[in-house]
C-alpha cells in the first residue's frame, strides 16, 4: 500500500461516500488526510488515529431518534404513524413505495460499506502507531491502546454487516481488504449462512480484546464497545438467524442468499446459549455487573452505572438537549415548551399493554372501563405513551380532537397519542428550560433476557422455568402485580405456542420505539398478518362529565412478501454482473 495516498475518496459502488449527520462524536474531515498523517509513527498519543475511529462512530453509527425523515422507524410498523400527511419517508417504508431505483431512508447500502472500508483502513494501519497509552482489556490485562482500537473497528464492522444482512440477506464480505477505485470489485454476494458465521466468528475473536463494564478509563471512552456488547450482538445475530424468515419459513426456499438451505431447530439452541453465556458471566449468575435498571426511564438518560443504570450495554451518545422532547412532545404548549408530535403511537400498540396484573382486559382481576381505559394498566404504558389525561409539564393533556393538545389543523395527532418514552420527566414548564442527557441505546440487558426467553422457548418442547424467570424479571421491574406468577400462571399451565405469543407481546411493550418491532414482524414472518389489520387511533368525545373513546381507522395497507428484504441498489446490480438481486425486485 502507498501510505502517502490521500483519502480524498472512499470509492464507488460498494464504497461510495456517506453523508450521515449525527451528533455525539467529534467530527473530523478525515477523508482529506494521508495515511501517514492519520497513522503516524511518531504520534505516541494516537491523536489522529483516535479521531479517525471517532469518525467511524460519528458517520456510520446511527441514532434511531426521529431518524427516518423526522419519524421513528416504528412509524413504519403497526406501533405508530407519522403526523406528516405529506408522503414522508417513513410512510414510503410502511406502504412499500420504494424500489431498486427509488431509495428511502433505512435502505442504506453504500453507507454501511463505507463504514466497513474505514474500519478496514484502521485495522490495516493502526499497528504502526507507537502508543504509550494503555487500557485494561476484558481479561484484566494492560495493553497498548491499539489493541482495543483494532477490536473496536472489528466490532463496528460486524455491526455494519449485521445491519446489511437483516435488510438484504447475504451480502458481499470483503474481509480486511481495502478496495480502491481502480480495483476489480465485481464480487458476488456471500450466502446468508456465510455472513452469519463471519459476524459470529469476528465477535468471538475480539471480545477479550475489548474493555469490560464498568469502563475504568471512562469519559472519552464511555461509549466504547465492550465484551458485553460483543456477546449481546452475538446473541441478537443468532436469534435473527434462527428466526422463521431465515430458518423455517424463507420466502424463497432453497435460496441461500436470503436464508438457510434447510430448517434446523438447533439454531434456536445456539441463540439461547449465546444469551445465557452473557447472563451467566455478567448477570445475576455471574459478576452482577449487568442487571435491570430499577427506573425504566433511566435506561436512555443515564450512562452506565452499577447502581443507577446497570442495564446499559452499548449506546450511541446524543448529548444534552431537548431535541427529542421538541420533536415528539404534545402540541398545545407555548414558547420553547411547544412540541411537534412527529410520531403518533397507535391504538394497536396501546392495546398490547396488559392490565396491571399481567393479564388481558377480559381476564384481569381489575375491572376494565372503556370510558377510563388507562386505569390499572401495565405501568410501562404511562412511560411509553402520552394519552388523554396524562400529565405533561404539570398539565393534564386534552388529546380529544380539537382539544388543547390536539388542535384541529394540518399538524395534529392522528391517533390522539404522543410518545413519552425517552423524554425527560419534566414536571413544570420552568424545568423544561434545562437540558437532558439522551442516549440511543443499541444493546441492553432487558433485550438479552427477551432473546434468551424466545430462543429457549422455541428450542424446548414446553416453556421451562428459565423462560418464565426471564419474563417475570421484566414484569417485576415494570411494576406488574406478583399475583399468579406475574400474570403468567403456574409453570406447565401454558404451552409453547401460548408462551410464544406472550414473549412476542412482552418484547413489543418492553422495547417500543427502540427499532425492534419493525424488524421483529419481519424475522417472525408475520408482516402479512400484522398489516392485514388497519392501524387505529381514537376519536375522543367529551360530553359534560362523560368521556367516550371510539376507535377509528387511521391508515390501512398491505404487505407484499418481497418486502421482507430490501432491493439491492440498481446501480450495484447494473455494474456488477455477479451481484444477484433479491427475489421479485
What positions do the PLM features span?
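Short coil/turn linking the two alpha-helices of tandem helical-hairpin repeats
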Residues: 163-167, 172, 214, 237-249, ...
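Membrane-proximal, proline-rich intrinsically disordered regions
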Residues: 21-73, 102-103, 353-371, 375, ...
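Conserved, well-structured interaction surfaces
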Residues: 45-63, 85-168, 182-219, 370, ...
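Short, surface-exposed recognition loops and adjoining beta-strand edges that mediate ligand/DNA contacts
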Residues: 67-85, 174-177, 210-229, 245-344, ...
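Bacterial Sec-dependent N-terminal signal peptides
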Residues: 1-31
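Long, intrinsically disordered, low-complexity segments
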Residues: 20-22, 112-115, 198-200, 296-358, ...
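Alpha-helical solenoid repeat scaffolds, predominantly canonical TPR units
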Residues: 118, 195, 202, 250, ...
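Flexible, polar/acidic helix-loop-strand segments at domain edges
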Residues: 128, 311, 368-445
Amino acid at each position: 500500500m502507498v501510505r502517502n495516498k490521500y483519502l480524498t475518496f472512499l470509492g464507488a459502488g460498494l464504497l461510495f461516500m456517506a453523508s450521515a449527520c449525527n451528533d455525539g462524536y467529534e467530527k473530523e474531515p478525515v477523508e482529506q488526510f494521508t495515511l501517514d498523517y492519520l497513522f503516524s509513527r511518531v504520534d505516541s498519543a494516537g491523536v489522529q488515529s483516535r479521531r479517525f475511529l471517532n469518525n467511524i462512530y460519528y458517520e456510520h453509527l446511527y441514532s434511531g431518534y426521529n431518524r427516518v425523515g423526522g419519524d421513528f422507524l416504528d412509524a413504519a410498523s403497526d406501533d405508530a404513524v407519522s403526523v406528516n400527511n405529506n408522503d414522508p419517508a417513513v410512510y414510503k417504508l410502511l406502504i412499500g413505495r420504494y424500489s431498486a431505483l427509488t431509495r428511502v431512508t433505512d435502505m442504506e447500502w453504500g453507507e454501511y460499506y463505507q463504514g466497513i472500508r474505514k474500519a478496514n483502513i484502521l485495522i490495516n494501519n493502526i499497528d504502526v502507531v507507537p502508543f504509550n497509552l494503555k487500557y485494561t482489556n476484558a481479561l484484566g490485562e494492560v495493553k497498548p491502546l491499539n489493541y482495543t482500537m483494532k477490536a473496536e473497528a472489528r466490532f463496528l464492522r460486524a455491526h455494519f454487516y449485521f445491519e446489511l444482512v437483516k435488510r438484504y440477506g447475504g451480502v458481499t464480505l470483503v474481509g480486511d481488504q481495502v478496495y480502491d477505485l481502480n480495483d476489480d470489485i465485481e464480487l458476488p454476494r456471500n450466502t446468508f449462512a456465510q455472513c452469519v458465521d463471519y459476524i459470529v466468528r469476528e465477535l468471538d475473536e475480539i471480545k477479550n480484546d475489548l474493555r469490560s463494564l464498568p469502563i475504568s478509563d471512562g469519559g472519552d471512552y464511555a461509549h466504547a464497545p465492550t465484551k458485553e456488547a460483543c456477546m449481546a450482538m452475538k446473541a441478537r445475530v443468532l436469534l435473527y438467524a434462527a428466526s422463521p424468515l431465515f430458518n423455517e419459513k424463507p420466502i424463497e426456499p432453497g435460496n441461500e442468499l436470503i436464508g438457510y438451505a434447510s430448517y434446523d431447530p438447533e439454531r434456536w439452541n445456539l441463540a439461547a446459549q449465546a444469551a445465557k453465556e452473557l447472563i451467566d458471566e455478567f448477570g445475576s449468575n455471574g459478576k452482577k455487573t449487568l442487571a435491570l435498571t430499577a427506573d425504566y426511564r433511566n435506561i436512555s438518560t443515564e450512562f452506565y452505572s452499577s447502581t443507577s443504570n446497570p442495564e446499559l450495554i452499548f449506546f450511541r451518545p446524543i448529548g444534552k438537549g431537548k431535541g427529542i422532547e421538541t420533536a415528539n412532545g404534545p402540541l398545545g404548549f407555548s414558547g420553547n415548551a411547544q412540541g411537534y408530535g412527529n410520531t403518533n403511537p397507535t391504538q394497536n400498540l396501546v392495546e398490547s399493554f396488559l392490565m396491571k396484573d399481567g393479564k388481558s382486559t377480559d381476564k384481569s382481576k381489575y375491572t376494565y372501563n372503556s370510558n377510563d381505559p388507562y386505569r390499572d394498566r401495565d405501568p410501562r404504558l404511562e412511560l411509553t405513551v402520552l394519552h388523554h389525561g396524562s400529565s405533561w409539564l404539570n398539565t393534564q393533556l386534552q388529546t380529544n380532537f380539537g382539544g388543547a393538545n390536539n388542535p384541529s389543523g394540518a399538524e395534529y395527532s392522528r391517533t390522539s397519542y404522543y410518545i413519552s418514552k425517552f423524554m425527560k420527566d419534566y414536571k413544570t414548564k420552568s424545568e423544561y428550560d434545562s437540558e437532558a442527557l439522551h442516549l440511543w441505546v443499541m444493546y441492553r440487558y432487558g433485550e438479552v433476557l427477551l432473546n434468551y426467553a424466545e430462543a429457549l422457548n422455541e428450542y424446548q418442547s414446553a416453556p421451562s422455568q428459565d423462560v418464565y424467570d426471564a419474563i417475570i424479571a421484566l414484569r417485576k421491574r415494570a411494576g406488574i402485580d406478583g399475583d399468579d406468577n406475574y400474570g403468567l400462571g403456574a409453570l406447565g399451565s401454558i404451552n409453547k405456542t401460548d408462551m410464544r405469543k406472550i414473549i412476542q407481546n412482552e418484547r413489543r411493550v418492553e422495547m417500543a420505539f427502540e427499532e425492534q418491532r419493525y424488524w421483529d414482524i419481519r424475522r417472525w414472518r408475520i408482516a402479512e398478518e400484522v398489516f392485514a389489520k388497519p392501524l387505529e387511533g381514537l376519536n375522543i368525545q367529551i360530553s359534560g362529565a362523560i368521556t367516550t373513546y371510539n376507535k377509528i381507522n387511521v391508515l390501512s395497507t398491505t404487505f407484499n412478501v418481497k418486502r421482507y428484504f430490501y432491493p439491492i441498489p440498481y446501480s450495484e446490480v447494473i455494474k456488477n454482473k455477479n451481484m444477484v438481486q433479491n427475489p421479485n425486485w
